[in-house]
Each structure stands twice: as structure tokens, then as C-alpha cells.
Regions:
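Short, glycine-/polar-rich solvent-exposed loops and beta-turns at beta-strand/coil boundaries
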Residues: 14-17, 34-39, 147, 184-186, ...
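A surface-exposed, glycine/aromatic-enriched loop/edge motif typical of exported proteins
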Residues: 73-122, 213-251, 305-307, 372, ...
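Non-catalytic regulatory/gating segments with a bias toward low-complexity or hydrophobic composition
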Residues: 22-23, 43-45
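Residues embedded in well-ordered regular secondary structure
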Residues: 51-183, 281-283
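Short acidic/polar hinge/loop motifs at secondary-structure boundaries
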Residues: 5-32
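Extracytoplasmic
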Residues: 17-19, 28, 38-42, 55-57, ...
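Extracellular/periplasmic, surface-exposed regions of secreted and cell-surface proteins
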Residues: 1, 195-204, 209-214, 252-307, ...
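Flexible glycine-/small-residue-rich
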Residues: 4-6, 26, 47-49, 62-64, ...
Length: 532
């Protein structure tokens, strides 16, 4: 669970320059107050905001970087590969002309000692008098599909204000070329954000934050799976099949990962994320603060990919087409998210006893709509569109909605920084579960003893800053399930393995009611801090 300024959000759409702090809550004792969504822990992100009276400041920074892939898989040398194949399968190889493995190893040794002694064409391809084809050049198929990438980042911000009015405006841009050997591997993101805070009266403050992020990711995508093909042996030639080697494959590109990257069409993914965050703060009494927060977050996802149709050849010398039936795929998804938080905090002391009590209410709702379409057999491959398909047109849509409602509290107790106690609790409900098991209570308690503050440790105070023993216990929920999984539905399942003739479709109840799950954590530890 990722909370950005106390509200769930997408960390990938946040400009790193706008982040003030990041806190990770890993155990149930600290995460229990976040209820049924904190099963995997909580990441708290706080964005930058001016504090107090601030003179006008204009900041600009940039970053230029190069990146290269590391720890690449190591391919076996061709001679070792051929020897292993000979030991396992015999002397006849499976490539064009059924070459002899033993002759290949001999030719390879000769070629290494004197390359001009063997007449090769293209990428080290030798056709013997008996029609068998031997591949002499070795290469790193993984390395051949990669290059050094370049990235540049730019950020600008303006900050200022008085003791009554404060503001911050920022914008950021990142452009990454990617490490694949193509201009189709790119990522770009633009962020703008603004914050304003006004002390309307001594006891009332109004804050407003707005942000907008737009990103575009483009990656080459092959219907054959370029990454999977990196398992090919190191003799696979790059480039195209030379003339005179194979009549069927003459002039066609070889089936290698680098060629697939070059010929494949890019899949394009666009994200737009506008967000508005409003916060009202009231301070009616000393130590007592009431806060009301409202957030609207919209996420727009737009995906498109056209498979294209490419004719290629293989080391067997054949001719093939991928895919045999080209298609255009488009997907759009819209998500509207609303969140309300209302909570109060009271901080007070009774002698040496310090208390901090917080209680509040939270409600969130999300509505998502997805549409997807595939159009087969494009008439104009240079400008593919859903309407220009000459074959099948498929369209589907999905709708998803859920809400969360809960009340929470936290009590902190501190006695002279020696004895520390924290109690948390949240009564949470989620629409993802049946009514009879929709709500759950998730408590936690943690205690600490700072031994360094005891009188018998006074002699260590000049070098020992803290020696704390702590223990905690907590229970958190898990609502990370589909929104309607508790509703029994009839779905279509295709049964394979031949037990139903022709793979006929059968219908069955495929889901069972879900129950809220609870994760328990018991922890203990010690903290030691030295003075220097």
C-alpha cells in the first residue's frame, strides 16, 4: 500500500524532486491503523511543502545519465555447444542441409586459424559442395540486442510565502531512450504540481494541492517473443540471408532477437493522472487539532499495438510469416477515485506523562471502466485502425467498483522518554467481501523501554545516546482480492488435455465466497545509538 500525502496513489507518477520523505512500515504494529489494505506493509510518501515564512526561491536542476545492461547471461562457446550436441544426439545436425557436426567442428577450427581459407558470405555462412550449410561466426545474441541508453531529467520549482500564505509550484520532465537497439524503446514523463496554504484565521488553515502527470512508454513487441529467443545458440547469423544459400530464404531477415526488435512494431502506453487534494485544519484548543481531507484522483490508461506482418527466414532456410493473421489491439481504462479523511489529534501532558490521542474516519471509493478491441486483417498497414480491419472485429468491456469505510484511533504514551507505549486500532469494512464478513477490527500494541534514560545508566550518557528494548503485536487485514470474487458466477472454461472431444467448452461455478483474511505479527528488537 502506497500513501502519497495520506492518500493512495501511483508512485511511478510522482516526480522524485517533489518528495520530502519516504517511510516504510513493515510490521503489523505500525501498519494496523491502515486496516484491510496493509497486509503487504505501507509506504508513506510526503511531498515538499514550504514551512513558515519563506522568501521567494527559484530552483532548477538537471541530470544527464548513461546506462548499460550488466550481469548478462553467458552463452556457451560454439565448439562446446557442438561437442555437447554430438555427445547427446549424434553427428547429424538439424539446420539447413543436415550438416555433419564433426565436419562443422573441423571447419570451425580451420576458420579460427585462417578465416580466408573458408569462403563465407553474409555473417560467416559457408555452403559446402554437398549442400550442407555451416555457420562460422559466433556472437552474443543478448548483447547484440542491447546498447547504451541516454537519459536526461529537468526539474524547476518556485517556493515562497509569508506567515499567512505559502506556495510551491514545480514541474519536471524525464526522457529515457532505453537500452534496446531501436528508437522504439522510450519512456517520457512530465509532471506539474502546485501547493498553496493559507492561514485564514489563527485557528483555521486551508491547504490545496493539485498535480498532473503524463507519461508515454514505447517498447518493441514481437509476436514471436524476442527475449525468449535469446536462448538460441551463438551461431545464429545476424542480418539477412545471402543470395545463393537458400532459395526460399534469400534476402529475408534471420530469426534473431536483434532482428525481431528491429522489425517489430512498438506497443504504446499512455498514462494521464490528474489529482486534487484539499485539507482543512482547525485548532479550536491548545493541543487539539481537527483535519478534514478530500482527494479526487483520476487515472487514464491508453494502450495500442499493431502486430504487423513480417516475412523472415531461419537457420533451416525456410520462409515464414509472423503473425499469419495480423491485428490491431487497443485498450482504454478510466479510474475515478475519491477519498475522505476526518480525524482529530489531542496532544497534552500530565506532569511527566505525555499523551497523544488521535481518532478519525476514512471512506474511499473507486470506479473503473475498461474497453478493449481487436481488429484483424488490416487493410492499410501503415495507418492501422479499428475500422480498417478486413476480418474479425472483437470488442469487450469491464466495470469494476469498490469502496472502503473505517474508523481508526491511536494512543501514544511517553513517560520521561523511558517508557513508551502505542496502541492502534481500526474497524475496517470493504465492499469486496460479503455483508456478513465485510467488517473487521485490526488492533496493535507496541511498547518500548529506553534503558539509557535510567539513573543506573547515567555514566554512559556521554557516549550512549539510546538503548531501547521494544516489543510489538499486531493484526492487519487483506482486501487484495477482486471486487466481486465472493459472488458465485458461471464462467466459460476451455478444457484441454484431450479428455473432452475437440476441446469443447463447459460451464462451471468457478469462484467461491471470499472471507476477510487476517495477518498476525509478533515482533521484538533493540535499538542502540551511539554519540560521536
Amino acid at each position: 500500500m502506497i500513501l502519497i500525502d495520506n492518500v493512495e496513489g501511483d508512485l511511478d507518477m510522482v516526480n522524485p524532486e517533489d518528495i520530502e520523505t519516504v517511510t516504510v512500515l513493515k510490521d503489523a504494529a505500525s501498519a494496523a491503523i491502515y486496516g484491510a489494505r496493509a497486509a503487504g506493509g505501507v509506504i508513506l510518501v510526503t511531498t515538499k511543502r514550504p514551512k513558515g515564512e519563506t522568501s521567494f526561491q527559484l530552483n532548477y536542476n538537471n541530470n544527464f545519465a548513461f546506462a548499460t545492461a550488466m550481469n548478462l547471461p553467458e552463452q556457451a562457446p560454439l565448439m562446446e555447444y557442438l561437442q555437447a550436441y554430438s555427445d547427446a544426439a549424434g553427428d547429424q545436425f538439424w539446420t539447413m542441409g543436415s550438416p555433419s557436426v564433426s565436419k562443422w567442428m573441423g571447419y570451425l577450427e580451420q576458420y579460427r586459424n585462417n578465416p580466408s581459407s573458408i569462403p563465407t558470405v553474409g555473417d560467416g555462412i559457408f555452403k559446402d559442395t554437398d549442400g550442407a550449410v555451416y555457420y562460422m561466426n559466433e556472437k552474443d545474441l543478448v548483447k547484440n540486442m542491447l546498447e547504451t541508453s541516454f537519459q536526461h531529467t529537468h526539474n524547476i520549482s518556485m517556493t515562497g510565502g509569508t506567515d499567512k500564505l505559502r506556495y510551491r509550484l514545480s514541474a519536471g520532465f524525464i526522457d529515457n531512450d532505453g537500452v534496446l537497439i531501436t528508437d522504439k524503446d522510450k519512456y517520457r514523463r512530465m509532471n506539474v504540481s502546485g501547493f498553496i496554504s493559507a492561514n485564514v484565521t489563527k485557528w483555521f488553515t486551508q491547504e490545496a494541492t493539485f498535480s498532473y502527470a503524463h507519461s508515454k512508454r514505447m517498447e518493441p513487441k514481437s509476436a514471436l517473443g524476442a527475449v525468449y529467443s535469446t536462448r538460441l545458440a551463438s551461431f545464429y547469423p545476424e542480418g539477412n540471408m545471402p543470395e545463393g544459400i537458400s532459395a526460399a530464404g534469400d534476402g529475408l531477415p534471420f530469426f534473431t532477437p536483434s532482428n525481431q526488435i528491429r522489425w517489430s512494431n512498438p506497443e504504446k502506453t499512455l498514462y494521464d493522472n490528474p489529482r486534487i487534494f484539499l485539507k482543512s485544519i482547525l485548532k479550536p484548543l491548545k493541543g487539539f487539532e481537527i483535519a478534514f481531507e478530500y482527494t479526487f484522483d483520476k487515472n487514464i490508461y491508453d494502450y495500442s499495438w499493431y502486430t504487423g506482418s513480417v516475412v523472415y527466414t531461419t537457420v533451416q532456410g525456410g520462409k515464414d510469416t509472423t503473425p499469419t493473421n495480423d491485428y490491431l489491439q487497443k485498450k482504454k481504462r478510466y479510474t475515478d477515485y475519491n477519498s475522505i479523511n476526518l480525524y482529530g489529534t489531542y496532544d497534552f501532558s500530565l506532569g511527566n506523562h505525555q499523551f497523544k490521542i488521535m481518532a478519525g474516519f476514512n471512506q474511499e471509493s473507486s470506479y473503473q471502466e475498461t474497453m478493449e478491441a481487436l481488429s484483424y486483417g488490416q487493410a492499410v498497414i501503415e495507418v492501422p485502425s479499428l475500422g480498417s480491419g478486413t476480418s474479425t472485429l472483437k470488442a469487450t468491456d469491464k466495470y469494476n467498483e469498490f469502496s472502503v469505510r473505517g474508523g481508526f484511533f491511536r494512543v501514544n504514551y511517553n513517560y520521561q522518554d523511558k517508557y513508551l507505549l502505542e496502541v492502534n486500532g481500526r474497524y475496517d469494512g470493504s465492499s469486496k467481501f460479503p455483508k456478513e464478513s465485510r467488517y473487521g477490527f485490526f488492533p496493535s500494541v507496541s511498547a518500548g523501554w529506553n534503558i539509557a534514560q535510567e539513573k543506573f545508566m547515567e555514566s554512559t550518557q556521554n557516549w550512549l545516546g539510546s538503548l531501547k528494548l521494544r516489543a510489538s503485536y499486531g493484526m492487519i487485514g487483506n482486501q487484495n482480492v477482486p471486487a466481486y470474487s465472493f459472488i458465485p458466477t458461471m464462467a466459460v472454461n476451455n478444457k484441454y488435455n484431450g479428455w473432452i472431444s475437440n476441446g469443447n467448452y463447459v460451464t462451471a461455478i468457478t469462484s467461491i465466497p471470499s472471507l476477510v483474511s487476517r495477518n498476525f505479527t509478533l515482533g521484538k528488537g533493540r535499538d542502540i545509538r551511539h554519540r560521536y
